[in-house]
Amino acid sequence: MGANVLIMAGGTGGHVFPALACAREFQARGYAVHWLGTPRGIENDLVPSAGLPLHRIQIGGLRGKGLATLLKAPFQLIRSLFQARRIMNELRPVCVLGMGGFVTGPGGVAAKLTGAPLVIHEQNAVAGTSNRALAPLADRICEAFPDTFKPTGKRRTTGNPVRSELFLDSSRQIPDGRRLRLLVLGGSLGAEPLNKLLPAALALIPVEQRPELFHQAGRQHHESTADRYREAGVEAEVVPFIEDMARVYAWADLVVCRAGALTVSELAAAGLPALLVPLPHAIDDHQTRNADYLAREGAAFLLPQATTTAADLAARLSEVSMHPEQLEGMAARARRLAKPDATRTVVDICLEVARG
């Protein structure tokens, strides 16, 4: 294996999955990929499973924390910076790629202190705290959505790295006489407001007009969600988690889901229209900004959680069921927003910086 590359990403799948796509691309080009994370994030499951060496530093989030945590913050930051710097000196990476999460703050500073080229990638339409802080230090800034960062010669709009199997070329035509196929996604933990809203909304639609329903409700909530559908007299397949996203994306005609950056990018890749219900308490309301990107282009409808009732959702579902051509147009517009070359582009930028 060739020279070392260090990827920094942690905390949630929204950071880790795009980073894994980049890791595979680096490996395909002959580079040895190392990973910088924390002891608590999802990277502790996913990165070793991918066969990648995981290096950990002690760092956590500060926003919204209590006074005691804030008082300890300077010491934690200094400790994590020394830990990250030691790892940089051991690995001597030709490039460091920051994909978000708490780990990227001290990791990015350590990269600059040790002279390693630094590239950052922001998955959301609103930049996270670490990436905002690192932007002046970074050699290149990659953004998934246009104009997330201020215009600069370092900025490139790349899209989000998405697994290649999710890019679906087939058209989204709904055959006459077939019921609408509705996919509901709540993420691995589930979105309990959606788990409550969907059964209530579907119960308001006449039985003969109801869509076929596949609902991913989260590991903790799938049984209670299935009970709600049964009590409402609505037929639905409810699962805790979906392993094969490509299969369910190919099956679906319409998706109801949150608006995390990775989800929005996957919808575009799969060419799927969506009803997006952004998480209302997301930091900087970034999910609303993510959703607005698809909604402005006519690829999705944005439904605020605070004002969307079961009756509102039932009416929207009934409308699109009766006008499948509307969904077909939304699907085509979603597909036009896809960035199939995002992974390759991000890695190209990293190696361009590495070569100086």
Swiss-Prot record:
Matching SUPFAM superfamilies: UDP-Glycosyltransferase/glycogen phosphorylase
Membrane topology: Peripheral membrane protein
EC number of this enzyme: 2.4.1.227
Segments crossing the lipid bilayer: none
Disulfide bonds: none
Enzyme class: transferase
Catalyzed reaction equations: di-trans,octa-cis-undecaprenyl diphospho-N-acetyl-alpha-D-muramoyl-L-alanyl-D-glutamyl-meso-2,6-diaminopimeloyl-D-alanyl-D-alanine + UDP-N-acetyl-alpha-D-glucosamine = di-trans,octa-cis-undecaprenyl diphospho-[N-acetyl-alpha-D-glucosaminyl-(1->4)]-N-acetyl-alpha-D-muramoyl-L-alanyl-D-glutamyl-meso-2,6-diaminopimeloyl-D-alanyl-D-alanine + UDP + H(+)
GO MF term set: UDP-N-acetyl-D-glucosamine:N-acetylmuramoyl-L-alanyl-D-glutamyl-meso-2,6-diaminopimelyl-D-alanyl-D-alanine-diphosphoundecaprenol 4-beta-N-acetylglucosaminlytransferase activity; undecaprenyldiphospho-muramoylpentapeptide beta-N-acetylglucosaminyltransferase activity
BP GO annotations: carbohydrate metabolic process; cell division; cell wall organization; lipid glycosylation; peptidoglycan biosynthetic process; regulation of cell shape
Function: Cell wall formation. Catalyzes the transfer of a GlcNAc subunit on undecaprenyl-pyrophosphoryl-MurNAc-pentapeptide (lipid intermediate I) to form undecaprenyl-pyrophosphoryl-MurNAc-(pentapeptide)GlcNAc (lipid intermediate II).
Recorded family membership: Belongs to the glycosyltransferase 28 family. MurG subfamily.
Name used for this protein in its record: UDP-N-acetylglucosamine--N-acetylmuramyl-(pentapeptide) pyrophosphoryl-undecaprenol N-acetylglucosamine transferase
The species this protein was found in: Azotobacter vinelandii (strain DJ / ATCC BAA-1303)
